[in-house]
Amino acid sequence: MMNTLNIDFQKTALVIIDLQKGIVPIDQSGQVVPNAKKLVDEFRKHNGFISFVNVAFHDGADALKPQTDEPAQGGSGEMPADWAEFVPEIGVQDGDYTVTKRQWGAFFGTDLDLQLRRRGIDTIVLCGIATNIGVESTAREAFQLGYQQIFITDAMSTFSDEEHEATLRFIFPRIGKSRTTEEFLEQVK
């Protein structure tokens, strides 16, 4: 049985990870952006804080280049000029708070934690791409920083069902609550 969500939109932020032109094509279901947009609309309705997060690099020299057994998916080389732009369907508006991260997690090397704390936010609703990379890294950082978390499972995706399910089954239950978009929207009415 799921615990009821007691959402105070003045203390809760929606954090959307990497819904940008170069990453959204990973979502084979096609449901991540529409579901995230429903969340954006709900947060806007309640004047809730939304953080749109993307990943970008200045010139490539600032990107990590670890020696690994499995190269990063997506290959290497120069990214298209619009690779880091948010997809227009998500509805980023002038004046919205955006974060550009240089690593997997949205907290490391950014002012996201500072901005959330200054607004009195203690809970984040998290969605985006990729479940087991940018989203999970952000979730782990948020957990270590003491935030309560709600993961919107059908507003996130990754390279394979196996990777997605591993995070949903083994990581998220230890650090927060998981809901679908409709479950979340129903519970905040």
UniProtKB/Swiss-Prot annotation:
Disulfide-linked positions: none
InterPro entries, alphabetized: Isochorismatase, Isochorismatase-like_dom, Isochorismatase-like_hydrls, Isochorismatase-like_sf
Coiled-coil blocks: none
Molecular function GO terms recorded: isochorismatase activity
Family matches, as CDD domains: cysteine_hydrolases
EC identifiers of the protein: 3.-.-.-
UniProt superkingdom: Bacteria
Keywords from the named record: Hydrolase
Gene3D superfamilies: Isochorismatase-like
The family this protein is said to belong to: Belongs to the isochorismatase family.
Protein name, entry field: Uncharacterized isochorismatase family protein YwoC
Origin species: Bacillus subtilis (strain 168)
Gene, per the UniProt record: ywoC
